[in-house]
């Protein structure tokens, strides 16, 4: 491992891109797009919503592009993403960025099998600058909390929603809400009820 980067910094770039899009283009609806499961659902079942997904890279893609541009010494290195999401692999394939999707649960299994305890190693800093605003991005409502730090007023025009029991029904009704001018400006949505931190690639039930 040549370097370790924190994707929270990329999340700040993602949120900034959202806000610039809202300010510059005045859309009537912006759907958060870091969750590949929701994007894939819209591609298959709700293509009418695709034009409303935020035209911005996910935090992971922002981070990888940042590495390529500002750390050229790693240009030839492959990128392994420590991820809470089994669906992230689809994003790698579709965009051509990212080489390995190493889920947190898989990493934990590998460490346990080899009797490796991370607590026995010294702490080290990330190789990129620390995030200031987006450290909570991967938790439910993290996008909204990050955006509020720049624009507090956006909270009144945002719908925060997560969890497979409700999110897909909501997406199914969203185009109708838009036509009736009842849709929020920003939809902060995730497939997993506990946010990415409790994603399908984590061991959150035993944590």
Which residues does each PLM region occupy?
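Iron-sulfur-associated redox domains of electron-transfer enzymes in respiratory
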Residues: 1-207
């Amino acid at each position: 491992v040549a370097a370790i980067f924190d994707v929270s910094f990329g999340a700040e770039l993602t949120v900034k891109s959202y806000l610039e899009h809202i300010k510059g283009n005045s859309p009537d609806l912006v759907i958060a797009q870091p969750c590949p499961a929701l994007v894939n659902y819209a591609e298959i079942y709700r293509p009418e919503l695709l034009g409303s997904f935020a035209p911005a890279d996910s935090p992971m893609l922002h981070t990888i592009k940042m590495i390529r541009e500002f750390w050229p010494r790693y240009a030839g290195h492959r990128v392994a993403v420590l991820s809470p999401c089994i669906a992230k692999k689809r994003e790698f394939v579709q965009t051509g960025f990212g080489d390995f999707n190493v889920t947190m649960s898989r990493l934990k299994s590998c460490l346990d099998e080899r009797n490796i305890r991370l607590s026995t190693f010294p702490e080290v800093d990330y190789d990129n600058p620390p995030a200031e605003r987006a450290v909570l991005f991967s938790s439910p409502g993290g996008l909204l909390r990050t955006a509020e730090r720049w624009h507090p007023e956006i909270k009144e025009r945002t719908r925060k929603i997560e969890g497979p029991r409700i999110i897909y029904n909501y997406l199914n009704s969203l185009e109708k809400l838009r036509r009736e001018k009842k849709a929020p400006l920003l939809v902060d949505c995730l497939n997993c009820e506990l946010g990415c931190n409790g994603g399908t690639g984590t061991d959150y039930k035993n944590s």
